[in-house]
């Protein structure tokens, strides 16, 4: 028997190496390894289409090989955000799929957001089981970069569809998702694919204190997701009397790849999607790329206009200036690990969650 610590450590190391060798023989090379043999690389991401949200996520976008949940009230921009992710993936040459469980995808609107619908794989499954089987085939193919499921609430179990209208089916959907996610999690990681679940909000009955809101599909999705995004409409954008868009806020309520509880605010314009020009103005002013004096904005000692909407009009007609400002903003974010902007609301949310 070894008498000193060094000999005991040597024996333990030999035993560990022997165990690793046996595991590799049983399950194949790469089934187990030390981290120094496979050093951690920078997380590969796909942009959300929003500079502010990419910054709030801390890694420059949605991480590949992970499961993502986007949830919020009706007409808050959930599908719009998911379509922007698809458009960004396609710009990089990626393949994408849209599982339209709600049977409500607006193809014309998707095109306006920059989605190449000719290259988009679309499925409209009849049951929740069929939807998850289709997702499993797509993920295991290794050929798809982004898969969007719209929505969790529409993943109706076969037993519920085949039953009578008034039948009670307690927990069927939650069990379906729990079983499906157990199978999909490792496959998504191996395929380096992003699997996005769009989810709806429901109200808990009888909640007096605390938040009565909850998401559909049980608790399994909350555990298996690496990133959860809470998207809300916080205001409207008007052009004189007409409403032309929504002011939108996204909270990163869960993040396994960077610090959570950050926020991003941006505009979603009708028939246009996320307003990149609005983000350029807001983030440019925050980062000091644009100079703001009262309601006036300036860039390189050149006055761009008075008021945010007038500056957006100027940048729309002067795309070279807009591209130059955007490049400077992204360079600043990249040099600070994409995570230098946390507004006061995010700091307060972080403090509440910690303390």
Swiss-Prot record:
InterPro entries: AAA+_ATPase, DNA_recomb/repair_RecA, DNA_recomb/repair_RecA_CS, P-loop_NTPase, RecA-like_C, RecA-like_N, RecA_ATP-bd, RecA_C_sf. GO terms for cellular component: cytosol. It is found in: Cytoplasm. Keywords: ATP-binding, Cytoplasm, DNA damage, DNA recombination, DNA repair, DNA-binding, Nucleotide-binding, SOS response. GO terms for molecular function: ATP binding; ATP hydrolysis activity; ATP-dependent DNA damage sensor activity; damaged DNA binding; single-stranded DNA binding. One of its GO terms (biological process) is DNA repair. Belongs to the RecA family. This is Protein RecA. It comes from Wolbachia pipientis wMel.
């Amino acid at each position: 028997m070894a008498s000193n610590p060094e000999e005991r450590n040597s024996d333990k190391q030999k035993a560990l190496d022997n165990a690793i060798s046996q595991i590799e023989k049983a399950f194949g090379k790469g089934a187990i390894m030390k981290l120094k043999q496979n050093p951690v690389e920078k997380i590969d991401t796909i942009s959300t289409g929003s500079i502010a949200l990419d910054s709030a996520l801390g890694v420059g976008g949605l991480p590949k090989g992970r499961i993502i949940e986007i949830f919020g009230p009706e007409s808050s921009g959930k599908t719009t955000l998911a379509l922007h992710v698809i458009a960004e993936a396609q710009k990089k040459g990626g393949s994408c799929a849209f599982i339209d469980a709600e049977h409500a995808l607006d193809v014309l609107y998707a095109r306006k957001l920059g989605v190449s619908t000719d290259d988009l794989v679309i499925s409209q499954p009849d049951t929740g089981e069929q939807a998850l089987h289709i997702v499993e085939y797509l993920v295991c193919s290794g050929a798809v970069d982004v898969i969007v499921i719209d929505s969790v609430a529409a993943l109706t179990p076969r037993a519920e569809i085949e039953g009578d209208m008034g039948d009670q089916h307690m927990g069927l959907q939650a069990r379906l998702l729990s079983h499906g996610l157990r199978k999909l999690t490792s496959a998504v990681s191996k395929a380096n694919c992003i699997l996005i679940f769009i989810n709806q909000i429901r109200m808990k009955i009888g909640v007096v204190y605390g938040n009565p809101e909850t998401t559909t599909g049980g608790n399994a999705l909350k555990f298996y997701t690496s990133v959860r995004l809470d998207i809300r409409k916080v205001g409207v954008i008007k052009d004189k009397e007409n409403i032309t868009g929504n002011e939108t806020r996204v909270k990163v309520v869960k993040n396994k790849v960077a610090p959570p509880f950050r926020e991003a605010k941006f505009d979603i314009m009708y028939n246009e999607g996320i307003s990149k020009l609005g983000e350029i103005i807001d983030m440019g002013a925050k980062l000091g790329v644009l100079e703001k004096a009262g309601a006036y904005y300036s860039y390189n000692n050149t006055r761009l206009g008075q008021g945010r909407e007038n500056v957006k009009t100027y940048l729309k007609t002067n795309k070279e200036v807009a591209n130059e400002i955007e490049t400077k903003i992204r360079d600043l974010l990249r040099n600070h690990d994409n995570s230098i902007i946390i507004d006061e609301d995010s700091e307060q949310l972080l403090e509440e969650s910690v303390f």
